[in-house]
Amino acid sequence: MKTKINEFIKMKGKNFSTNNTGKRKKTDFYETPYSLTELLLEKENIIGEILEPSCGKGAIVKVLQKLGYSMSFYDKEKNFLKETKKYHTIITNPPFSLAFEFIKKAKEISDIFFFLLPLSYLHGKKRFDEVWTDKKFPLARIYVFTRYPLLGEKLREDGKHNTGMMVYAWYVWEKNYKGEPVIRWLDNNKYIIKRREGYNHCLWDIKQKMNNLDL
């Protein structure tokens, strides 16, 4: 028991939802399981010209394009914080270290934007003073996932994912929205990989790789 407690103390503050090293590797992408975007689109009618400014390998873009949305997207090759073009809608899983700056920029160039962030992002005095009390471009809705989604894994086409230890939510900011923010839930339970299912999928993946080996 003492050993387990010591292990927990060592891991305290690390991002459980990405990997168990606590460090973000240069090759880490923190990709968004397809189902997280699909569930949002079941609740929100996204319109107008769309931008995804932190697309990584294109997980969010793939879902939107599959549904017929036309959009612009980029990643590190362009600095979103210097963007001047106006877009009606922005949807992204922003780099957490730049989330505050991304929010400020999105308010300058869009009418509505959707950011995937940890639920704990609601906490903080600076955010309260500069983000949550903004009446001209307020937070309108928060969509909280009922199960903790694990980000950063290799994505599955069926949208299923493992569970992590970080609560995530879609935050929706809407220009000129009136009223208090509304909290809603997105039930992602059907997309959670069950233990046996994950084991079988792992075996299938190994077999596929072995079949592709040139022996």
Predicted regions, residues:
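Class I S-adenosyl-L-methionine-dependent methyltransferase catalytic core
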Residues: 1-215
